[in-house]
Amino acid sequence: MKNMKIGKIDGSITRIGNLMFIIILISLFSCALKKNTSQKIMEESVHQTEGIIQAKNDLLVGKSKAICYSGFRTGQHPDRGDGAKNPSYEEVLEDLEILSEKLNFQLIRIYDSGENSELVLRVIEENNINIKVMLGIWLRAELSNHNTCSWLTEPIPQDELEQNKKLNLVEIEKGISLANEFKDIVVAVNVGNEALVDWNDHKVNTDTIITYVQKVKKSIYQDVTVADNYKWWADNCAELAKVVDFVSVHIYPIWEGKDINEGLSFSIENLEEVKRTIPNAKIVITEAGWPSVAYEFGERASEEKQKQYYNEFMSWTQEMNITTFWFEAFDEDWKGETNNMMGAEKHWGLYTVDRNPKEVIKAQLITN
């Protein structure tokens, strides 16, 4: 009986030993697998950045962090056919002091060469604010793309298109004039904003934009560019890329159905797509952002997710030496649907329309 017990004990020890041996083997295999997986991810990450990383001197005026600025507050708006209601001198000054002193932005983008943009430049000059500007030349529709733009329900009348061509020439002359008058503040000029994509309502022919770019380049000393969606650049850019001084791309993962867990990786894929087409072009990201509220996106839009995308993407582009204009500084409630204040177009800012900071920058304000 005693020998039988000893035999049972020996058998149990053997089984335990075998089980422990199997566990050790599984652990070793798991560690090796994790190591190989991590190494693969790192190698893929390095591979991604090898095709995208730029030289330090590719940064616009040496800045990686920049921001899009449009100062329209509640009750204010640009010209929508019945005249504009612009911010006051004091309001613009308040905004620029927030951006330069509280958030340390020293490079902003403005979208047109109208009265409001001239005011922004004058406020910077007269108050000696440490901010440089990418000036915009806004182009109106010269083609009716009512078949591809979802909110154009009927063709744009031909007489309106002809009038727009004249107004575009006037806008170009204004842009040239402002760039030359404020040559110490304006560091680049952008001709047309999302005027090349089929889905927008102010489409202009590519050859026409090339002609406009060449005209502006002959008249100013600053760099000249055209800003549009990354996909347009990846698919259609061959001729335009030859005449601009750098390529300006827009990236919005959330508009393409992505949630925050894919925000950074999808943005990198967008840039890779552009780089494959024009590998030697200097790239500036002139719009990238994440809304804090949007009925269109449901839970994909939130202040926390905006904060995460801002921190991840802006850090990554800094490492890549890519100047990135975050879209945007302040919410603008004049945009989008007038009867729905929860629309995405109204909620891209780091601040609300009332100039209250969102989660994305509260930590920065405490630090500063």
Spans of features found by a protein language model:
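Aromatic-rich peripheral "rim/lid" segments of glycoside hydrolase catalytic domains that contact
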Residues: K40-D58, G62, E299-S302, W316-N368
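Aromatic-lined carbohydrate-recognition surfaces of secreted/lumenal glycan-active proteins
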Residues: V213-D235, A281-G289, T323-D333
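C-terminal motif of bacterial Sec signal peptides marking the signal peptidase cleavage site
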Residues: L28-S30
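Conserved, mostly hydrophobic/aromatic
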Residues: I108, V189, V247, I285-E287, ...
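Aromatic- and acid-rich polysaccharide-binding/catalytic face
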Residues: L135-I137, H146-T148, V187, N193, ...
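Substrate-binding cleft of extracellular glycoside hydrolase catalytic domains
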Residues: L119-Q222
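Active-site clefts of carbohydrate-active enzymes
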Residues: V197, D201, I251-W255, T277-K307, ...
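N-terminal carbohydrate-binding/catalytic regions of secreted carbohydrate-active enzymes
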Residues: G62-T148
